[in-house]
C-alpha cells in the first residue's frame, strides 16, 4: 500500500456497472465526464477516483493507478514516439476504440535539476523544476496545465510516484469536472511521466535538448520512447547503475522534430548521472549513449549537452545558451554550499532558477512545478507555479 503524506485523504468510491455511455453512479464522484473507451469496471473505478488536492481548483490532482499498464508489452511494441505510444494506449489499455479521434498526445520538457547530500543529515536530495510553456494554437496566450501525481505499484515491480503534465494529452486545468473532457486518456498516465521516484529511492527526470532527436537503430535491440524508458526505470531499477545498464539494452528514439532529451537520475546511495545520446555531427541523429557521472560539475543540468562529444557543437556546453544562465546559477549555488544543501536551501536554488510569466516565451520558459526529492526517505515536496509558501507532500512506503 502506498503511504501518502499529502494532507488530502483519498476516499474509496463504489461504482455500479456501467454501459458504454453511462457516467459513474456514485454520488461521491465529483465528475460527470465520460470515459468512452473504458467498459471494464476496475478501469472506470480508477479514472473516476482522481482527487483534486485543492478541493475544486483543478490545478493539481492525484490518482493511484490500480490496473495493469502492460509494461512488458510496451517494451516490445516498438514505441518510437508519441504516435506509436497513442496507438499502444488505444490497442492495449482501452477496452474499445473511440468513436472520434483520440486527443493529440504531445511531449516536451525544459527544466533544471540537481543532486546533492543533505548538509544536516545523511540523506540525499534531488531538486527539479519542470519548465514548459503551453500556448493556445497560433497565439501567445498561455494555457494552464493540470499537474497529476500518479502512484503505481505493479505486480513484481517497484512502487513509485511520478508526475505528469496533463496538457500533453490535451487536458486543461479543471478538465476533470468540465463536463466535456473524456477521461479515457488517463489510462496513459504511467507513460506520460516527466519525473518520479520509486520505493528504492531511485529518481529520474527528463530535460530538453536542442538539435535532432535521438534515433538508435541496432537491429538486435527493441526500440523504446523517452517516457516508456522512464517507466521501465522506475518499475525496475534500484540504483543509477542499474538504470544505466537497462537503458543500454534498448534503442532510444525521441520523436520531436527539432529536439532531443537527456535524463538526470540519482539514488539513495548518493550516486547520480546524466545520460545523453550524442553525435558530434549535428546533421545526423544522436545515436551513442553516454553516462556522465563521477564529478561534482555533473550534479546539475539544464538544456544543453554536457558530454565532451558535443562540447563544441552549437548545442553543447561551449556554445549553447539554452538554460546556460540557470545552469551557472545552480553551479554557483551548489559550490557556495560546498555541494551540500538542506531541503530549504535546495528549494531556494529552485527558486533562483525558476521562470515566471514575464520570462522567456520559448517552450521551456515557464516553471510549472518545483520539487525537492528526499531520496533517502522516498518523499517529494512539491510547489506549483512558484507558489513557494504552499507545498504538496508525497511519499512511498520504503522497501523492507
Feature-to-residue mapping (PLM):
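Bacterial N-terminal signal peptides that target proteins for export
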Residues: 1-5
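Hydrophobic alpha-helical transmembrane segments of integral membrane proteins
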Residues: 8-9
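C-terminal motif of bacterial Sec signal peptides marking the signal peptidase cleavage site
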Residues: 13-17
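N-terminal mature-domain region immediately after signal-peptide cleavage
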Residues: 19-238, 252-253, 335, 339-400
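Non-transmembrane alpha-helical segments in soluble domains
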Residues: 231-234, 244-247, 331
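Secretory/export targeting leaders with adjacent low-complexity proregions
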Residues: 245-255, 263
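Long, charge-rich alpha-helical interaction segments
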Residues: 314-343
